UniProtKB/Swiss-Prot annotation:
This is Hydrogenase maturation factor HypA. Belongs to the HypA/HybF family. PANTHER family: HYDROGENASE MATURATION FACTOR HYPA. Ni(2+) binds at H2. It comes from Methanococcus maripaludis (strain C6 / ATCC BAA-1332).
Length: 126
């Protein structure tokens, strides 16, 4: 279950960002949601990622934060016919160009795992 390491990375990144804000004198109340961009080729289960995040963030300001994920389709570039576009992911190990059937292709995406943004509530009242 590699979802645990990904969820831990997200939590640590958000907590680091919160520490930076706190050094600027801002008081964080809570994190309400976190938006992710996840490539299909990471083979992550979003449901498992959300569950694990819920468990590990329990005693933090991220407790209750909604983890949202936008899945990113893999893209390929064919070295033979120069086709560039989305790759239809099937249960096959061999990747072929959908235009010419060549296996001489380069992956150009689909392995992403990015934090797009997070909504953080601050207590800025003095």
């Amino acid at each position: 279950m590699h979802e645990l390491s990904y969820a831990t990375s997200v939590l640590n990144a958000i907590l680091d960002a919160i520490k930076q804000q706190e050094t600027l004198g801002r008081k964080v109340i809570k994190v309400t949601d976190i938006n992710l961009e996840i490539g299909d080729l990471t083979l992550l289960s979003v449901d498992q990622l959300q569950f694990v995040f819920e468990v590990i963030s329990e005693d933090t300001v991220c407790n209750g934060a909604e983890l949202k994920a936008e899945m990113v389709k893999p893209k390929i570039f064919c070295m033979d016919c120069e086709f560039e576009g989305n790759l239809d992911t099937k249960d096959e190990l061999e990747v072929r160009c959908p235009k010419c059937e060549s296996v001489n292709v380069k992956l150009k995406g689909g392995k992403e795992f990015n934090i797009v943004n997070a909504t953080i509530e601050f207590d800025d009242e003095e």
